[in-house]
Amino acid sequence: MITNAPRACLALISLLAGVALAAPALAQDAAPVRQSLDDAWWTGPILATGASTLPKGRALIEPYLYDAKPYGAIDGQGKRHAAPSADNYGSQTYLLYGVTDTFTAGLIPRSGYRRAGGRSSSGVQLGDLTVQGQYRLARWKQGGRTPTISLMLQETLPTGRHDRLDTRPNDGFGSGAYATTVGLNSQTYFWTPNGRILRTRLNVAYTVLGHAEVEGASVYGTPAGFTGRARPGDSFNVDLAFEYSITRRWVAAIDLAYQRDAATTVSGVDGAGAAYARRSPVSQALILAPAVEYNFSPVLGVIAGARIIPAGRNTTASVTPVIAVNYVL
């Protein structure tokens, strides 16, 4: 299954496109009825963040569960090579609150468990914690051309373990560094020829990371006895997402994303006191995330799909099955 991931991805994308394109042909003999916004319920795609803010006093809870499974290592020329099998189980939960109608704040806690190389984590491990604020700059109105636009600011705190992993190499789920992300999110609506709604999101974000003090074996590949620091590379991400309303409850969704991570540098001394320096190459990844949403009501829905990295440079080809529940209180 994993080795055929790119082929499966293309099949899923073809299915999503076919749903949108086939419907007009079935309705040639009758004028399509334009779907109303009230008749379309959404959870949101797997990756792209919404530009809308919560109404004042409302809250959102959205837990994600996933398992990142590598199926190849992609080198600097974009060629894929075999990679050891592994399971990287994880969870992250969006806990958001509408402070005002135009400002939403929240937390994103993370945790994980890994099985790789014949060894497992000693238990469920905490990851880094993100604090988030989002301010809405513009709001889409039906008949208008301006999308909903918001400015997002995130600060990720290094709460997860990242070093001193000499006896438990699979316990590292943190970076050890503070990370500041600035993003611009937009969202708008289109009506397809058959009258159904196509909701579209565009996210652009840049993340600046600080230094991490490192001792011993770490997530940066340092050996036992090492003392020094690591500087993770800054990251740029752009994500274009589409959601097609099949019925009021059912939605087909897909994210098309690109991520570039700058080089990570590590410097210090090893256990023998000799100088130790490493620099990882710049990595790039093409990310696809097809999914299906089912909404029980306008405030409760579930989404299931996969985050797939089929191509890139100096990255890991992987398939990550994902399921999430979206609930607005």
What are these regions (language model features)?
Residues 26-72, 141-148:
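Outer-membrane beta-barrel biogenesis signature
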Residues 32-38, 66-92, 170-171:
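Surface-exposed strand-loop-strand hairpins of Gram-negative outer-membrane beta-barrel proteins
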Residues 50-58, 102, 139-149, 191-198, ...:
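Short loop/turn motifs that connect adjacent beta-strands in outer-membrane beta-barrel proteins
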Residues 52-54, 97, 135-137, 155, ...:
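Residue-level signature of outer-membrane beta-barrel architecture
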Residues 59-63, 105-107, 131, 147-153, ...:
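Transmembrane beta-strands of outer-membrane beta-barrel proteins
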Residues 65-71, 109-115, 137, 155-161, ...:
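Transmembrane beta-strands of outer-membrane beta-barrel pores
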Residues 68, 72-81, 215, 224-329:
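Outer membrane beta-barrel transmembrane domains
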Residues 87-91, 122-131, 147, 174-180, ...:
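Residues that define the transmembrane beta-barrel architecture of outer-membrane proteins
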